[in-house]
Every structure is written in structure tokens, then in C-alpha cells.
């Protein structure tokens, strides 16, 4: 797999709580230059970013982030607001308290409501795999499939761990046809990226891959 093919799967991400507009601009410029799938940025920057890229790049943002326990109504509003401001893709965090209470029906209904507001915009569902048992992850693969979401996503990048090969393997085995996989958090090498893609991920959430590609390009033997 060539580097350009990896870059096409990347949601080039900056979600730091202290992110400044010049830093967001750099993310947007790099994402456009390297033709990544999208740039994933805080919701407060979506309107300005959408105007800045002027249709040349998909803008992704997050809702219910990073803990997921805001109410469904709050997440629905966040979704509507983000789309009105120019977001093309929404990454939502599920309410893990519902999961731990065994209330998967509520999780599914919340995703359905948000997908209804997304309409043709892509919806990715963050399940925070590092907080799940294998059984919970398998159940959530079914929940996300039935809800009509476009992607199941491993991680926020703000919890105890990010994506693992094992979790992506489970997702690939149990998620339904038509639902794609996004691996996010801790993807720090091109080899890791290739492995995640080989295991079934079609999107990668990372801030590091472009930095790695830039460093490789500056080496004397690079071309």
C-alpha cells in the first residue's frame, strides 16, 4: 500500500482543548495538501474552517465529546448546529453509562435520533473500546449496525487507550454489512496504519501520519 492510499483514509485530527486558530489552519492546510479524507476539529471552529477550505476538504467534528454522557437532546442539538455551520461528518460519543447498565436499546435509539438529523452527512459512532468488555463491543457492533450509522469508531483519544488491532478485528467480524470501521487514537506509524487497514479499518483518526510523511520526505534517500 502506497503512502497516498493511507492518507486517503485519514481524518487529520486536532481536538486539543487549547487548539488555536493558527494550529487549526495548519491542520486544514496539511489535510488539503496531502488529500486526506477529512480534517477533524472542535465544533467551535467548524464554521470558520468550512469557510476557509471552501469545499476543498471535508470537515469533521465531534459531539458529546469526549465523555458521551450529555443528554440525547443535547447531542441532537450539537449535531444540528455543527451541520448548519458546515460540518460534513459527525463523530458522536455514546453514553457508556447506558452500556454499563445493559441498556443497549437506549444507546441504539440515541444513535438513530442523531442519524436522522445527519441525513446524508456521515455519522461515526465512538464506542470507546478501552472501556468495554469484548461482549459489550460485540453487542455494540449490532447496535451500530441496526441504528443506520455509517461507521463504528474505536476511541476518542481522550481515555485510557486508543485503537488496538484486536478491537478492530472484533469489529470487522461482528459489524454488519454497510457499516465501516474507524480506528482512532495512538496510531503513530505507517506500519500501524497499514495493519489497521488490512484488518478492516477504512478510516484512521490520527494527527501523526502527516508528520511522519513530512519527516520521511526530508530524508536524503526519500523521493
Curated annotation (Swiss-Prot):
Biological pathway: Carbohydrate degradation; 2-deoxy-D-ribose 1-phosphate degradation; D-glyceraldehyde 3-phosphate and acetaldehyde from 2-deoxy-alpha-D-ribose 1-phosphate: step 2/2
Catalytic reaction list: 2-deoxy-D-ribose 5-phosphate = D-glyceraldehyde 3-phosphate + acetaldehyde
Predominant place of localization: cytoplasm
Pfam families from the UniProt entry: DeoC (PF01791)
Family the entry assigns: Belongs to the DeoC/FbaB aldolase family. DeoC type 1 subfamily.
Role according to the record: Catalyzes a reversible aldol reaction between acetaldehyde and D-glyceraldehyde 3-phosphate to generate 2-deoxy-D-ribose 5-phosphate.
Protein name per UniProt: Deoxyribose-phosphate aldolase
Source organism (scientific name): Streptococcus pyogenes serotype M6 (strain ATCC BAA-946 / MGAS10394)
Amino acid at each position: 500500500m502506497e503512502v497516498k492510499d493511507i492518507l486517503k483514509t485519514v481524518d487529520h485530527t486536532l481536538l486539543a482543548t487549547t487548539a488555536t486558530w493558527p494550529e487549526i489552519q495548519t491542520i486544514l492546510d496539511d489535510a488539503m495538501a496531502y488529500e486526506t479524507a477529512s480534517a477533524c476539529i472542535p465544533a467551535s471552529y467548524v464554521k470558520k474552517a468550512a469557510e476557509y477550505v471552501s469545499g476543498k476538504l471535508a470537515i469533521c467534528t465531534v459531539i458529546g465529546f469526549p465523555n458521551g454522557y450529555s443528554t440525547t437532546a443535547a447531542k441532537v442539538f450539537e449535531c444540528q448546529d455543527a451541520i448548519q455551520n458546515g460540518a460534513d461528518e459527525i463523530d458522536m460519543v455514546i453514553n457508556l453509562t447506558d452500556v454499563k447498565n445493559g441498556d443497549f436499546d437506549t444507546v441504539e435509539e440515541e444513535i438513530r435520533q442523531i442519524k436522522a438529523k445527519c441525513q446524508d452527512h456521515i455519522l461515526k459512532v465512538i464506542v470507546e473500546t478501552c472501556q468495554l468488555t469484548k461482549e459489550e463491543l460485540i453487542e455494540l457492533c449490532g447496535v451500530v449496525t441496526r441504528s443506520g450509522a455509517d461507521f463504528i469508531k474505536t476511541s476518542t483519544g481522550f481515555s485510557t487507550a486508543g485503537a488496538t488491532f484486536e478491537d478492530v478485528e472484533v469489529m470487522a467480524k461482528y459489524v454488519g454489512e454497510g457499516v465501516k470501521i474507524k480506528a482512532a487514537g495512538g496510531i503513530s506509524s505507517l506500519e500501524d496504519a497499514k495493519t489497521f487497514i488490512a484488518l478492516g479499518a477504512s478510516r484512521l483518526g490520527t494527527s501523526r501520519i502527516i508528520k511522519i510523511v513530512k519527516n520521511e520526505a526530508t530524508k536524503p534517500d526519500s523521493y
